[in-house]
Every structure is written in structure tokens, then in C-alpha cells.
Amino acid sequence: MAAKKSGASKELSPMMRQYLDVKKQYADYLLLFRVGDFYETFFDDAATISAAVNIVLTRRSNGSAPDIPMAGFPYHASEGYIARLVRKGFKVAVCEQVEDPAEAKGIVKREITEIVTPGVTYSDSILEDRHNNYLAAVAFLKEGRTPVAGIAYLDVTTAEFRIASLPPHSLRDTILSLGPAELLVSSSEKSRLEDLVRGYATGMLVTGLDDWMFSEEQAETVLSRQFRTHSLKGFGIEGNRAGRVAAGVVLQYLDETRQSRRAYITRISEMQGGEFMTLDLQTKRNLEIVSSMQDGSPHGSLLQVMDRTVNPMGARLIRRWLQRPLRVAEAIAERHDGVEELLQSSELSEGVRCSLSEINDLERSLARIATFRTSPREVLQMGRSLAVFPQLRDLLLPALSARLRSLAAVLQPLPELVSEIERSVDPECGATVRDGGYIRSGCNDELDELRSVSSMAKERLMDIQREEREKTGISSLKVQYNRVFGYYIEISRANLDRVPEGYMKKQTLVNAERYTIPALKAYEEKILNAEERSLRLEAEIFQALCASIAERAASIQESALAIAEIDTLASFALSAKEYGYCKPEMKEHEGLLITEGRHPVLERIMKPDEPFVKNDCHFDGQQRMLMITGPNMAGKSSYLRQTGLIVLLAQAGSFVPAERAEIGMVDRIFTRVGASDNLASGESTFLVEMNEAASILNNATSSSLILLDEIGRGTSTFDGMSIAWSMSEYIITRLGARTLFATHYHELSELEERLPGVVNYNATVVESGERVIFLRKIVRGSTDNSYGIEVARMAGMPNEVIERAREIMSGLERKDVSFADRSFSVQENMQISLFDEVDSRLKTALQDLDLERLTPIEALLELEKLQKLLRGHS
């Protein structure tokens, strides 16, 4: 802050002293200070906002003190500017003028009226309607000697509120998978949590709070107050101490950010790990569930293919379902049966989707209505949405699917509330309450009377205009109104000599003068008084209506959840119909059988004349690890991802892209596919790879599905091969998990003879002269050719480099290299016998060459090193 608190502060203007007093209380927020028609910022805030939203940084006179930095924007444009600031991770406090400046005695009174943070916002300008916007908190406790991390997350716009307890080592994955907009931590833990997610999370604000807010006693107090109960046993969270503390922190933060109207948050539940398949962040990224690895956008993701929902509530739910597949067989079967019935009955499916399209985003509308941040138009739409419930209910109650029937039974039509909304809100209402006129005529007798008075008075004004024209002989005389000067008589400058003596001047314009007269003042007072009372009464009626809707929050929220699920099941059914998916059979054993499986995303983005190659996948007691060899671009990685996505879709409740699928329940899917440096954490490609591999070996069970692609390629050939071999042994002998292992190490195919459960497969190719055709078909057996040079040719390498690489490869395969390379200035046709040299270092250097990873240029450089080594011994 630029202002000093010594004697210099006495030189500040009264308004700036007021500003600094407020800023002191909200030091961590950008303070928007209302001055007339603008929101102004000062000192450091001004510089920050100027840079963040590209507005002019200027200076303001400050009495006898030096000028101060200032930046601002018009109040009517505030929503857009606040949205831009919050999306960039800033917290904003809005300080409004709470009295009329014309009536103020001294400095205008101002108060904080709104606080907006990334995790606490109701603004459509900030929110994405197809994403949840979570506010999360983390608390650390000890249960005995064991440290436990509690996490709670709340979406204030939908009232979804959940808690969980987990070991601290799982915290990063949980936070990043959840993707909260804002994370609350104790100030003493803030640096540690920021370090934990640095390099992984973008756009997440970490907010430090006072340590005293993280006490169990404090949590119990705020939770009991929120849910109006002496015990939390009814919510099933009484055993989760750390999670309850985190939930208490979330509610206290809502107090701090002035979110006092939160009675619509009616429930809290524990996230039970046993109900859901575990997908760590790496697996979600590698399988491209909600975003592509290429650019992080939804394009090319599983979500983009599967999301056929028609309602934002359904869109948010299908996103959650795909990231949290089920592990409970009965619940999965209920979803499959619901999808099947919607798939088999086009009439039912189309009727359901038509009804869903008429329903508004009830969750977010309810949150805005309950907090009085709504509009008449939104309340009217709430009534229209509730009115659709009976027809949707009637469609689904006769269904054969038990799940569809139970969802239909949840829908509560609330006819009394629908009637109350229809009686109260004018169907032609505007988008805001500012100008009134949104309460329907006949709703309230007093309001109708005030409107009648106002209407009659306005008719009298027209009479005054006619009378004054006759009296003065000025035919252009007009009685008009504006917000600043009220009602007035306007006379053009050409007619000023005809103005009667009784006219009182009100305003001078370039081409006219404005006057008033006693009769006009009397009716103005009557009109404005009636209009002011009308506006006030309309606001009271509207707030009472909003409160009436909020009283039904629990029922509306339950119906909203049912509607979201119906929408998601209908979306799955539409995908199954249009894409040709089959109903998977869920089994209790740990096998897996996929017949003619397809990759759900790749088959949608391929060219029409390029049919997708279908592949089978089979695991049972004898086949636990499929060792897949073959060249790059032959489809190994796609096959791994395809298998993982089919299992994920099945356990999410969807049909799957296959001719037939039997899925033994999977508790976790692990992926080790591709790698890159994590520079932010100082981790090399190989270290990242080994961290991921270690996590798999330490956490997988016999019920897991492991997808491994090129383990060990980040180090030397023999190191990598040894690690891959050892991992394979460990998985087979210790874990027994179903594993797909794609590798360039053809030597690993020997494991089929050594380890029961390992079975060789390969990605087939057809050779045509020096060219190869990748068939992308996975078949039984192994291969020992990677066709790396052919891939280099397809990538556009110069022909000279390709031919030289073939020459070098041919020599290496004969364990004899003969070459004449002018770039190394060696004697023409020099013959080198690599194994005549007695120096063992030469032999070791050759053995360490990783031929599968070397590019042609790198191969030449390695040969140059061998030459130099030879010369040193000649």
C-alpha cells in the first residue's frame, strides 16, 4: 500500500481515509470503491487492475497529499471486468455507496456489499455451465499416530457438498482430479500445498486462512448451525473427523465472504472410496477423459464424444460419471438397464429428451434465487421448468427399468409453487428488477392501486401539457422527465419571450430552457411517491416469492439430481444407438473379454473412407499379462487406451464400443503411457516414468487393470530392459493384475516361456519391398522388427539419411560395420572388425547402444565415438 500511516495520512482527503479503512479489513482483495458512476481502485490495486484488464492507470488529486495511482471502470460494465479479474485468480471486494450522495452529510457512507472469489461466485460471466465450480478445503489431523488429510468441496452454485479422508500421499492426485477453482488451507500449510500442486494445477487459487479456523470445535459449531442439528449422524459423516474439519473451514469462508444466505445448502455426504473406481491424475490425462493431451481442450476427449446431454445439469453429471466410474455391480447394472430401455424405445427416448430441453439449470437457478441474486425472468423460468415435471414423470413411471422408475418417483411437481410463480410474475417481465413492472397485475391489491395512481397522474400531466400550450400559445411546449431533474416543462429558445411569470427555471440548455410550475411539482411528487412505493412493494413481493422457492430447496435439488441422471442415461443411450455400442456384461471374476473392440474417440474422428480396425482383448486365469511388440504407429498405444476406455465406460454405466464385452470388475486403472520432463519439479523424463511405475507397483491389486507403454526407454537399453523385465515378474508373481504391456524390447517376449500368465501379442505389419503397411491389428505371437527406419521415412526424413540409416542398420545386424563416410574424414573403404579389439571398453560401448532409440544422425555420431576409441588403441 502506497499510503503511509504517519502524519502523512492526516493529509489524505476524507474519501481516501475512508478507502484505506475499508482496505485494511480486506487487504487480500482487490477493492472496487464506488465513486459516482464508477468503480475506482487506488494505490497497488490500481496498478494490478490496470495490468490485469488493460485499463488506463492514472492519478488522482489527494488534498494536500501527493497524487495517488488510480484506475477504474463504469459501474454498468462491472460484471465483465469482475469476471475477467476472478478468472485470473483475483479475489474482489465491492464497496458500494449506501446512501444518496445528494442527501449525505459529509462523506458518502459506503459498505462492502459483495465479495467474489474464484470459488465463491454465482455469475454466469465467470461460471461454465457444463463444469462444476468447486471451493475446496484441506485439513490435517492425526488419528492415533497416523496423519490423515481431510478434504471438503462445495459448489455454491449447485449445493453439492462432499467430504473425504485420505492418506497425505494421495492428496495431490485428489486435489488435481477434483480441479477446484479455489483451495483453502491454513496459513502455516500454504507454502507446502502450493509446492505440492506447482507445475500441475493451472488457474487454481490457494487461499491461506488463520490456523484457528481449522479446529474440530469450530467445525462442529458451524456445521451444526448450517444444518440445524445437534448431530451429524444423519448425514453419515460422524466418523470422518478430518473431513468435517475441512467442511467447517468451507462454511467459515462463506461467512468471511459474506455468503449469509445459504439455507439452500441442505445436505453433506462422504465420498466413499469403495463405491468408485480409482483413477489417478496420470490415468485421467493419458486416457484423455475430459481433455486432450495435445492442447488441454475438450476436443478429442472421451467427454466430447459421449456428452449428448441437453441440460447443463446432465452435462456436469456425465463429466463426473466419466471421471468416477462405479465399482458396485448392482448400481452399474441399474444404469445399464436404464440405458437399454431408452435405447430400445425411440418414442420414450425422444419424449424424455424433449422434456429435458424445456427444463432450466435448476441447480444454479435455485442458488441464485435463494441468495436473491436472481431476476424475474429466471424465477419465471423456474416455474416453467417445474411445470414440466408431471409430463416427464408420466413418461418414466411405466418403465421396466427400476432405475428409471425410481428417478421418476423423485420428481416432485410442486403445483402450488408453480401457481404462485405464475400469479406473481408478469410473463412479459424484463431481465432486471431495477425498473419495476415485473409483478403481475392482480397479484397484490395495494400494488394495483399505486399503479393506478401513477397512471392517472401521468394522464393529468398530459392535461397540464395541453393546458400550458393553450395558456402560453407555445405549441412545441413539452412536459418531460429524466432521472436527474424529474418532471419539467421544456421551451425552445425561440419561444422564451412567451414564458409566463409563474414559471420557475430548472435547467438551461443550449437550445432550450427547462421550467417547473406548482401544479407540475404537486403531480410529480404524487407520481414519484407512487412509483417509489410501487418499486419497494414489488421488491418485497419478489423477495417473498424467492424465499418461498428457497423453502422447497431440498425437494428441488433432489429433483434436479434425478433430472441430471435421466439426461445422462439418455445421452448414453443416444451414443449407443448412433455409434453401435453393446451392453457390457459385468462379472464378479477378474477376467476380461472384449470382442471386436474399438477406440470410442479415434473411430469418431477418422476419415469416412478409413474404417477403424477392431481388436479383441482377453484376460483369464491363464492370461494375466499381454506382452505386445511391434513398430511405432502400428496401434499398440491406441489398443492400450481403447481397452482402458471400454472398461471405464462399462463401469460408468454406458454401453461400450465392441461386438461383445464381459468385464470383470476393476478397482483401479493405471497407465504408464508416454513421458515428459516435469521441469517445475526438477524431474527428468526417466524419473517421471519411474515415479509413475513405482506408484503402480505400490498400489495395484489383482483387481486392477494396468496399461504400460514403453517402460524403461528413458535410460540405456540394458537398464531399461532390466527394469521392464523385473516389473513384469513383479506384476505377475506379486500382483496378478490384468496388464497390457507394449514394448520395443523384443527380448521381453521370452517371458512367455518363463512366467505363467504372460502371453505374447504383436501389432501386425505387411512388408512390400522396402515399404511396410501398418495393419493396426493385434494378433497372437511376437515380432522382432520395429521398422523404425520406415517410420522415419514416413516422417519426411531426407532420402539420403534414410538410405544411410539402412546401410548402418544392415552392418550392425551383421555385427560388422563397413562404411565410407566423408564427414568423418576416414580412409576410403576402411574395414573395421569390431570384435578383434581386445579393449573391453569398445565392446561395452557397442553393447550399450540403444538401436531402437537412435536416430540415423545419432547412430553416425556414436560410430564416430567408436572410431575415436579405436584410434586410441591403434
From Swiss-Prot:
Keywords: ATP-binding, DNA damage, DNA repair, DNA-binding, Nucleotide-binding. One of its GO terms (biological process) is mismatch repair. GO terms for cellular component: cytosol. One of its GO terms (molecular function) is mismatched DNA binding. CDD domains: ABC_MutS1. This protein is involved in the repair of mismatches in DNA. It is possible that it carries out the mismatch recognition step. This protein has a weak ATPase activity. This is DNA mismatch repair protein MutS. It comes from Chlorobium phaeovibrioides (strain DSM 265 / 1930) (Prosthecochloris vibrioformis (strain DSM 265)). The lineage of its organism: Bacteria, Pseudomonadati, Chlorobiota, Chlorobiia, Chlorobiales.
